[in-house]
Amino acid sequence: MLPLMLAASALRAQSGTTPGAKYVEKIPGTLITFEMLPVPGGSVTLETAAGPRTVQVAPFWMARTETTWDLYDVYVYGFDRSAPRMPGEEAVSRPTRPYVLPGDAFGHDGLPALGMSFQAANAFAHWVSVRTGRTYRVPTEAQWEHACRLGAQSTADIAARSWARENAEQRTHEVASKPADAFGLHDVLGNVAEWVAGVDGDSVAKGGAYNMAASEMSCSSRMRQTAAWNETDPQLPKSRWWLPDATFLGVRLIRVPDDSTARGTRRP
């Protein structure tokens, strides 16, 4: 785990390369919205098993908050089905409904969606793309860490801006209920860890969660999935969609700018 100051020194943000202004996305057929912030391009140095690796990051947008249950429920339960169908919607996969909703005891409205598998997170991003006509994705590790470092936080900042073991009372909290980081993103560190496509080709979770100490959180914090994340799943084979014991794991969407703005289209 690299100290925040060393991490910040590895970042070379390029001015004038933002993808555009911030905007609010709305899911057709619903009242659900979420805000996207532009992230400038740059380069970021990541720690890998083979040593440091510098990755160039093109400009993109990132969601201001972690995905909430309010939005994820629309995807899971099809609350958008009354809206006009979009081209490509027949290829959208939706999760099976969980036997017990992960983290159900925490509450629901305004809280981060959690316990979805990496496959489910990617399918969710595809659904948002089809419904909006814009290309949404689960971030790569380089994109996520680049955005995190732009809002680089000191140890004192993390304690004040993050839901961690010291203040979270072993549960998630409403997104954006803590102050944003210097870049305007909420809960990048803490609350729930966030799925990314790892630089080494594996899926990993970044940023730490409410059950971690604030001192353990940094932009380079990462977790790999273990068997314990779906240990209590009663299904055989176990669900591809849900990790019932990963009540500390969510997702934050990004959008790439070189897409079509025509609704219902989606570039690979």
Write out the residue ranges for each language-model feature.
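Disulfide-stabilized, aromatic/cysteine-rich ligand-recognition loop
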Residues: 15-16, 21, 118, 179-181, ...
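Mature N-terminal segment immediately following signal peptide/propeptide cleavage
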Residues: 32-43
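N-terminal export leaders
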Residues: 1-2
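Short, well-ordered junction/capping motifs at the entry into regular secondary structure
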Residues: 160-189
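Short Gly/Pro-enriched turn/cap motifs at secondary-structure boundaries
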Residues: 27, 52, 174-177, 241-245
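Active-site microenvironments of metalloenzymes and redox enzymes
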Residues: 56-157, 255-259, 264-268
